[in-house]
UniProtKB/Swiss-Prot annotation:
Annotated phenotype, changing Q375A: Slightly decreased diacylglycerol O-acyltransferase activity
Name the record gives this protein: Diacylglycerol O-acyltransferase 1
Pathway: Lipid metabolism; glycerolipid metabolism
Intracellular loop 1 (IL1), as annotated region: 224-276
Record-level Gene Ontology MF annotations: 2-acylglycerol O-acyltransferase activity; acyltransferase activity; diacylglycerol O-acyltransferase activity; identical protein binding; retinol O-fatty-acyltransferase activity
Entry GO terms, CC: endoplasmic reticulum membrane; membrane; plasma membrane; specific granule membrane
One of the GO biological process terms: lipid storage
Organism annotation: Homo sapiens (Human)
Amino acid sequence: MGDRGSSRRRRTGSRPSSHGGGGPAAAEEEVRDAAAGPDVGAAGDAPAPAPNKDGDAGVGSGHWELRCHRLQDSLFSSDSGFSNYRGILNWCVVMLILSNARLFLENLIKYGILVDPIQVVSLFLKDPYSWPAPCLVIAANVFAVAAFQVEKRLAVGALTEQAGLLLHVANLATILCFPAAVVLLVESITPVGSLLALMAHTILFLKLFSYRDVNSWCRRARAKAASAGKKASSAAAPHTVSYPDNLTYRDLYYFLFAPTLCYELNFPRSPRIRKRFLLRRILEMLFFTQLQVGLIQQWMVPTIQNSMKPFKDMDYSRIIERLLKLAVPNHLIWLIFFYWLFHSCLNAVAELMQFGDREFYRDWWNSESVTYFWQNWNIPVHKWCIRHFYKPMLRRGSSKWMARTGVFLASAFFHEYLVSVPLRMFRLWAFTGMMAQIPLAWFVGRFFQGNYGNAAVWLSLIIGQPIAVLMYVHDYYVLNYEAPAAEA
């Protein structure tokens, strides 16, 4: 606050009358004085005493505080310009911790300790002498070698572009069909093991698709340069690789293990491996893996089991209650999974391989539209879709709406592929959920903006996923437990 008497030039004598020659300047001076605080006396009295170190004027020091009000808005009013709500945010965090602590204690009292790390092994192996899922992952190398051999022959002209395209299409189709057939036919493979094997083959499919596209672009550029009578610049930069020198097993397998789906001849590389950074990421991976397993066994499984009877009885009020009860642990586990995969795991792999591009996610939590969320929460997949699906469709004359719909259609197919095949049942809930993102994106973009749009995105994430989980669990329970019991 300070001493107002020393900060303003002291006025002596009386003020000019409003009927005198003061005019607008005098009026402006009165407004400034009123906003500044207490006024001096009409006859040039001394200003009010300076406040003490606590910001209050001395008690009993006089009666100079003739005015204590000024024109101002309440802090919660939008016109106040106040934006520091850190204390309220801390209060929300405290309330969230307390409410979830109560739920955790209630769960322990009701069910006891259900966490069993040994039980997790049975999710991956049904028969200790039969390991079909790891064998499927190892067999994926055959498809990688096949794609490499096709590219080697295309580079030297031993195959025509049409023959190479046909071989690549057959190889890519087999990558998706072969593991699905094994999962559906081999009884000893578990749903979790099937999911991991199919995810490995799906990632390989996307990587080899990109590998084929980029090498094809390089051949076109080389042919175009040759037809124009130009020589390819091989000395553009030191330590860079040009086509076809990139066609080596070392280059291929670096790409297959790198945390990206888009192939390049020269990836950005970090100068060294940071051991402390790598150790932190590995510890995070171990900790969050155990945390996710514990939350699923202790919190989600009992909730899902208790949701079967309301579904069977079609008790809609109880179904909604179970859905909301499942939404909290499901969303918490999904957030932990996001951090575990996109920050801990991918950064650990990138650090080991000195892979320089670490943009695996953007600020999707600030999404004010559904479209922004899908563009920023999974950057490796988003880059692949834009580079190898969206832009090629635009170049072939498709509209932006058609290209965007095509991207969601492909995403819906892979979501259904990764859920229905391991569960050995086809209900299209995942496919429908992904395709529903198109009208949802339009609805949120049309009727919600700013914070309301962000709240709508969060609501769709919190409620949408548990609906799909309950649908699949209910159908799986009916198919594998109720139907055999009824037949018996």
